[in-house]
Amino acid sequence: MHLKKIAIIRCLKTSASCAGAGCLRAFYEKDKAFALYGEEELRLMAMWTCNGCGDSMLENQEGIRKKIERMKALEIDALHLSHCTSKKDEQGEKHLCPTIKAIADELADCGIKIVQGTH
């Protein structure tokens, strides 16, 4: 059975008040979005944040390039987009953050599976 290499990306703004415990619990218990792997062996290769957007954008934006290149070098099988990477609009509909979408699109173009959600 093939070992699945998994990474989780989360929102920089949310990480100020979130320890990531829900994402990690779901991963280790193969619950919620990780249930799709069934009995496959998983390895968490990275749990990382974007470099922000709007007022929270980090000055060093070249760091995000390093993170993206690291994901490619690790040859991850799937990138899970944490629950916090989508926000509700005024009508209550969830939309993926444009910054996260750009990162996910680039990694998807390299053959990495993008999975919406963690817990």
Model-predicted regions and their roles:
Residues M1-M71, G92-L96, K113:
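Conserved mixed alpha/beta catalytic, RNA-binding, or beta-rich assembly cores of soluble enzyme
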Residues T85-K87:
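Oxyanion-hole/transition-state-stabilizing segment in secreted/luminal serine hydrolases
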Residues A108-H119:
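Divalent-metal-activated hydrolytic enzyme cores
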Residues I68-M71, I103, L107:
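Hydrophobic, Leu/Ile/Phe/Ala-enriched alpha-helical segments that form helix-helix packing faces
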Residues E90-E106:
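Short Gly/Thr/Asp-enriched flexible loops that form oxyanion-binding sites at enzyme active sites
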